[in-house]
Amino acid sequence: MEKFGKYMITLLFFSTIFSYALAQKKPNVVIILTDDMGYSDLSCYGNPLINTPFIDGMAKRGVLATNFVTTSPTCSPSRASLITGRYCTRTDLNWPVGPGEKPCLKDSEVTIAEMLKPAGYATACIGKWHMGDYGTALPNKQGFDLFYGMLYSHDYRAPYVQTDTVIKIFRNTRPEIYRPEDTTLTDLYTKESIKFVNSSAQKKRPFFLYLAYNMPHLPVALGAKKSGLHSAGGALGNVIEDMDHSMAKLWQALERNGQADNTIFIFTSDNGPWLNAPKRMFEDGITQAYHIGTAGIFRGSKGISYEAGHRVPFIIYYKGHTLVNTVIRTPLSNIDMLPTIADWAQAKLPAYTLDGESVKDLLSIKNYHKLHKPIYYVNRVLEGVKEGDWKLRITTNDGKKLKEMYNLSEDPAERVNLYDNPVYKTEQEHLVMLFDQYPG
């Protein structure tokens, strides 16, 4: 009996060790989100002046997508969709939210952080939040153990925005830095991210880091004055190259901790460049139109449901899982991130309707072919739908409806409107049907 007892204790001990070892194999997740970055703002996406060696290197290690879109062309809605896997009309955040404004991210929404926490993940939101500044909308109430950053954009100050709110860097719910200098933001966020990685690795916990940089959202002129920045791409290039250098430091921290090979690395932007920025953004005497990013051949701007507002850089790397040095031209969207992460992490999905789909197989299997379900473009209200190569856009201006249809494989710049062209009647009828079936 004594021997049997010892045997059971030994078995229990090794079972515990085995279970713990399995827990450590859960992949870490790092999502790096830039602000208002244009499709063509990185050297790996064709920019001839801005040098981004780190992110270019990650694209060579993994996958670069040329047809990745955000489901909304503005900040708060896009971020809400990314972090919940749902269209913004479900989350109640269909427009950028200001200080104290309603609505904000609903308590009933399940974020990536809330999905991963039951699986033992440490979670951190570092950088720009912009999904609500009170109550249950705060990051610590949305599944994040740590919040370090600001609740809005860094332009929420005079002369850019007329508000009584003072920009602050918070540590969880307590202000820590008042009126932070633009030159310090990227460094502050990166250092805090490295601390979080170090701490999680020491505790042997899988972790989720959501790192949302403020740049290159206007203004960039002040941030670009940081010592040591001399990009051929000017002020815009300075802040982007600064982020690239900072991401390299973060990756080195992952390597030092032996975590790089077990980390899902995702890089993207919340929406396209603010090419139609209002006059107030230029009243500081130093901001120039050429400080705004570019969207290459794509038409439109942030805040507009043409491709430039939605189509953004997307790079993903997960050693041994993602394809290597591969360009994917299949349509993808930011709402696909939550289900894809759940698939890799074997996390339980939220018990309600998700709009995104897991694209793990597309990112992992060479020559994988499966039609992505329709992707909807929501700009406060539903304005478009894309399936495969075809996109339908329906907008209302002064009570008049404008209906547009484009074959994006042949006309990515959306120059030739094929709506009501009898040659494409079948495609038009199909897209109109999909538009009317918007699930959000």
Question: Model-predicted segments: where are they?
Answer:
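Bacterial N-terminal signal peptides
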Residues: 9-17
